[in-house]
Amino acid sequence: MSFHHLCSSPSSLLHDPLPLCNLLSVYPKSTPRSFLSSYNPNSSHFHSRNLLQATHVSVQEAIPQSEKSKLVDVDLPIPEPTASKSYVWVNPKSPRASQLRRKSYDSRYSSLIKLAESLDACKPNEADVCDVITGFGGKLFEQDAVVTLNNMTNPETAPLVLNNLLETMKPSREVILYNVTMKVFRKSKDLEKSEKLFDEMLERGIKPDNATFTTIISCARQNGVPKRAVEWFEKMSSFGCEPDNVTMAAMIDAYGRAGNVDMALSLYDRARTEKWRIDAVTFSTLIRIYGVSGNYDGCLNIYEEMKALGVKPNLVIYNRLIDSMGRAKRPWQAKIIYKDLITNGFTPNWSTYAALVRAYGRARYGDDALAIYREMKEKGLSLTVILYNTLLSMCADNRYVDEAFEIFQDMKNCETCDPDSWTFSSLITVYACSGRVSEAEAALLQMREAGFEPTLFVLTSVIQCYGKAKQVDDVVRTFDQVLELGITPDDRFCGCLLNVMTQTPSEEIGKLIGCVEKAKPKLGQVVKMLVEEQNCEEGVFKKEASELIDSIGSDVKKAYLNCLIDLCVNLNKLERACEILQLGLEYDIYTGLQSKSATQWSLHLKSLSLGAALTALHVWMNDLSEAALESGEEFPPLLGINTGHGKHKYSDKGLAAVFESHLKELNAPFHEAPDKVGWFLTTSVAAKAWLESRRSAGGVSA
């Protein structure tokens, strides 16, 4: 081991009773190996060299007890013992044993510890420091100086002690004393003093060594300035210093935190190949790197690799993994990691619970999110505005009205945060989805009293609420408020108006047409053509509808077509509904509605509104009838209709429940599959027989 690493373990200095200056004066210094003429981690030289001799230990790692006896400078071999320097066994029962023990170096080490404590406690001026050192009561050797500085903690007096010792003893290896002084600065996280001391070394012509750089690098990491750590690391080669693999492993973390992801991952690849020892902090940084880049599988791979290497995850790692799985919308994996955390004896902290709330809330895992919320309340943990809002948004998505009210009341009563615009928006949306008009109006009033003007999102929810309650006049009044506030309706707002029209009695639809025309003239034109039964030339409606589709965003195209088809079905205009469905197929807005295999033909409806699903069923049955009865095409053994098993966001029923009733009305031979939720199946024989009966009866509409 290089002598400059003796500073990492003061007790190791005590195995040789000789004054260190005697050893240093006899043996010449070895020439340090150069690192690289320029730092290039991709060069074959950089990747293939053994960076250290086997005995090298970094100042950044603890030294095992078994190694302490080996802490001898590779440049300074131990001299052969002479008769004058040989050890003498002392009988512990001897009356002189106590006196001899006091003279032993163990006793001297204790006195050096007390000297370090006295120097820490004295005033930071040269006179007081000199008095303490002079009052030590004996000559200080170079080894004593190293032990003393290594045990100091006061960054104000340490440089004064260093200067005093340099002047009084003229050490042969000054760099060692500088290194242990830097360790004092590292203990107090004083990077500025470390860098200033480095400059002083250069001014005095003292060449820094590996320990100098590793100490400054670790200080920079502790101070949370990874870019400075990178700067110091990249200076090493210019001073002929070569980092050990412990320092290299630490730089994975530093490069990652500094934003140089490519370098961090490059070093990590080397670490795996050369089997460096990587600590949990570095693994945590790697997980963060992959999480920020959106490589969530990479996060899990790092987690599995560290477990395979026997590195135990810490709480920070568990929290980052849970947060990453939340961002990936993988709440089931967040739940598994949380169970690992508990199984391995960790106690979840605020960050753990916050990550779980976000993970479950974003994915609409309502019961799990509420369970974590209640556990936080039981433990007296406060929530932030963002966490409250995440829970309220989840309640809106899951229509948890009572739970939303409970969370909102808790938020108002807590002293740590106040409701903001997002809070009221989510609360109003909860009530709007359930058609609770009075509660939505009360929440809107509270929002205004709190100093927040309603946003377009809020007013969209209010209109949706009035629409569900069939309060058409209030819909019109709210629309006028939007214009009065100078808010420009967007595609989603217009889609909401269109959705309200599908829930409005036909005799009142006329009140809403004017609103739609003002909000989006092209949409108003298409709606008027549907509602007012305008006679137009063939192809005109398709042209107008196509122009509408071209004018709206891709995120709302399907919603618009669903609503237009629903409106057609409500008005009993099946031909127009089929025309709009066909447009959706041509524009690839509706995809994957049908699938065919050798054993089954299927109709997939779960992404459609009720009217669009019924229209698609009508078209499919006509296609089946044409294929079987006119073209003579053979059916596969099974035919199926897949409605899905979820509920619509603003509906109490899912497609499955509605279709079960509708298929019975048609006397269709499709029956719900007991082992496949949301699937209705029939055999080819039964289907053909039913299609024959429909044709005989005059082709009753689906």
Curated annotation (Swiss-Prot):
Gene deletion effect: Reduced plant size and pale-green leaf phenotype.
UniProt-recorded Gene Ontology molecular function terms: mRNA binding; nucleotide binding
InterPro entries: Pentatricopeptide_rpt, PROP1-like_PPR_dom, Smr_dom, TPR-like_helical_dom_sf
Subcellular location field: Plastid, Chloroplast
GO biological processes: chloroplast organization; chloroplast RNA processing; positive regulation of translation
Residue intervals of the Smr domain: 603-688
Pfam families reported in the protein's UniProt record: PPR (PF01535), PPR_2 (PF13041), PPR_3 (PF13812), PPR_long (PF17177)
Summary of the tissues where the protein is detected: Expressed in leaves and flowers and at lower levels in stems and flower buds.
PPR repeats: 174-208, 209-243, 244-278, 279-313, 314-348, 349-383, 384-414, 420-454, 455-489
Presequence extent in this chain: 1-53
The keyword Plastid is assigned to this record: yes
Keywords attached to this entry: Chloroplast, Nucleotide-binding, Plastid, Repeat, RNA-binding, Transit peptide
Statement: the UniProt record of this protein carries the keyword RNA-binding: yes
Function, in words: Involved in chloroplast RNA processing. Can bind RNA. Involved in chloroplast development. Involved in chloroplast ribosomal RNA (rRNA) processing and/or translation. Required for FtsH-mediated chloroplast biogenesis. Involved in translation and accumulation of chloroplast ATP synthase subunits.
Family the UniProt entry places it in: Belongs to the PPR family. P subfamily.
Name listed for the protein in its UniProt record: Pentatricopeptide repeat-containing protein At4g16390, chloroplastic
Organism: Arabidopsis thaliana (Mouse-ear cress)
Organismal lineage: Eukaryota, Viridiplantae, Streptophyta, Embryophyta, Tracheophyta
